[in-house]
From Swiss-Prot:
GO terms for cellular component: cytosolic small ribosomal subunit. Keywords: Ribonucleoprotein, Ribosomal protein. NCBIfam families: PRK00132.1. The keyword Ribonucleoprotein applies. The keyword Ribonucleoprotein applies. Belongs to the universal ribosomal protein uS9 family. PROSITE patterns: RIBOSOMAL_S9. One of its GO terms (biological process) is translation. It comes from Pseudomonas syringae pv. tomato (strain ATCC BAA-871 / DC3000). It holds the Pfam family Ribosomal_S9. One of its GO terms (molecular function) is structural constituent of ribosome. This is Small ribosomal subunit protein uS9. It comes from the Bacteria.
């Protein structure tokens, strides 16, 4: 891999994002679509930009992302995690600030499986005493 780009893999819930940072002007491309086009929700766009705004590198990189699996929230979280890892590969001194903001840690919360005899993972059928 060339030294002109940095790579990071991000995961959240069932979503996986492959993130490439290249020197540029701040364009963010997700699955060959713009950030605004890919995410309809403003909160998802904000989540994706968080590590860049924290490290003040918004205008410094062009970001190319391939993301698969999950929903809107999971994909946004996976992209944020991938951008964070790529930024740390670019400059290790950013790790402290990113760690303090909580972007470095992989959010390990997953959907709990449905159990036999229950309606959902924990919801039980109504109990009848008589």
């Amino acid at each position: 891999m060339s030294a002109t780009q940095n790579y990071g893999t991000g995961r959240r819930k069932t979503a996986t994002a492959r993130v490439f940072l290249r020197p540029g002007t701040g364009n963010i491309s997700i699955n060959n679509r713009s950030l605004d086009n890919f995410f309809g929700r403003e909160t998802a766009r904000m989540v994706v930009r968080q590590p860049l705004e924290l490290t003040e590198t918004v205008e410094k990189f062009d970001i190319y992302v391939t993301v698969i699996g999950g929903g809107v929230s999971g994909q946004a979280g996976a992209i944020r995690h991938g951008i964070t890892r790529a930024l740390m590969q670019y400059d290790e001194t950013l790790r402290g600030a990113l760690r303090k903001a909580g972007f470095v840690t992989r959010d390990a919360r997953e959907v709990e499986r449905k159990k036999v005899g229950l309606r959902k993972a924990r919801k039980r059928p109504q109990y009848s005493k008589r």
